[in-house]
Every structure is written in C-alpha cells, then in structure tokens.
Amino acid sequence: MNSGISPVPHGVAHYENFPVASILCPPALRPAIAAIYWFARTADDLADEGDASPQARLADLAAYRADLEACAARQTTSERWAGVFKPLQHVISQHGLPINLLTDLLSAFEQDITKTRYANQAELLEYCRRSANPVGRLLLHLYGVRDEASLEQSDAICSALQLINFWQDLSIDVPRGRIYLPNSSWAAHGVDETQLLAQDVNPSTTHLIAACAHSAGSTMLKGAQLPRTVARQLGGFNGWRAGFELRCVMQGGLRILDKIAAIDYRTLVQRPKLNRWDAAVIFCKALRA
C-alpha cells in the first residue's frame, strides 16, 4: 500500500479503499479479504502497470475474466493466475460471494484502459459504482450485513474514497492523459482542457478541484452510520474491530481532503500523502467518531 488513503482501482501500488486483512479485521475473515484483495490487485496490475499496449492489456483482462468465470463455475483455471484463483474459488464457495461484484471490478479496469474523459458527475459515479462500490459490498457480504440502507451507505463511502483518490492523484493521472474531473464542471469554473493538460495552477483550476473535493467529503458523510451497523451485526470485540477499521478508513479519506485543502487545492502539480502524524490523527478521530 502507498501512503495515500489507506485502504476504490487506480494503479496496482495505489489500490486503495481496501483494508488488506489488517490486524483489525476479524481473524476468521482475513483469508477471504486477502483473496478478494489479490484478485483486484492483480487485475489492476494487468490494467495499469508496465508498458504493454492497450490491446495487450485488454486481452490479458479478457483471459483473467475467463479464469474468474471458470473459478465461479468450480472449473479448472489457467496456471497463469493459479495463486489468485485457487484461494478465491474456496472463498466464493465458502461465503457465496456475488460474482457480479467481481466482474464489475473487471469492467472498471477495462474502462480505465479505454476511457480517459468523463462528461459529467453521473458518468463518473457510474464508474465508481463498478470500480469502488463492489469492494464495500463484498466486505459487507462477508460481515453478513445485507440491508439496503447499509449497502447505500457503503456505496457512498467507497465512491467518496475513489473520488478523493482521483483529486489526490491529479498530478499523476493528468500527465498520463486521464482527466477524471467531469467535463460539465469545467465551464462553471472557467476551465478548459488545455489548462488541465498543462497542469496550470490558477484560481479557476483550484476552485474546480475544491468544489470536487467538497462534494466528495459530503458524499463520505452519507455513510457515517455504517461502522455502528457493522459493529452491531458482528457483535463483541470482532464487531468493534471491524467498525473501528471502517471509521479509520473514512477518517483517512477525510484527512486526505484536509491535506488537499492545506496545499490550496494545487493537486495538479502536488500529491499530498499521509504520514505517521496523520496516522495518529486518524486513529484518534476514529476513536471519537
């Protein structure tokens, strides 16, 4: 994991919004969470790492999808990713994981290869629905939390984390030709594509980023009740640990927003990171939340 938001797909070294079988996860669920994580991280690697052509990346993801389908059908998968699909097959069987959530993740990775602009917020949130929200829904499935209100709160948290990661990573994504800032919001702030591609830091671009960051923070807060629900569902110390971990994840995202604000929303040229002091702040805020 990098020093960004700890634990939505966005570069294999930056795969975020995912608690990777940490010490706070209920021990019985750590193998399942690790299997899901490695499935997602490996797919992210195929989509975003190295110097393969877009066509080669898409071909690899198609082969990976075929292995997932074989895995879900309890059939033999290829040797190439046996280390991913053997444990995942056991987890799917043991926990009855919804396969559509795993295929949604793959479709988002595929989209990241072919799509570099988003017309409006609705289009961006549709991407988040497949790139980030499945992570939360898979975890809730493992926790036995299935009610619609909790799923919606999880979606809000995961989408917010993905959006925060986008606004944190503008200095990385824009030079690669990826602009996640919705086109429909540019004109309202007097921004055009030329300014963004030139990574021009001026009042217009920083106001645009600020508006997007504030929106992500508001979305995050829609999930504020979910940690309590998870803790109540699991019960006991395991419930407290899972709820506390979720509060830490949320506070990590909000802390990144604070750090984006602290550099005056200049993330077109500067990427804020969390440090040890931030970790202490996150821990304390999560305890009080």
Per-range role (PLM):
Residues 1-161, 167-289:
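Catalytic cores of Mg2+-dependent Asp-rich isoprenoid enzymes
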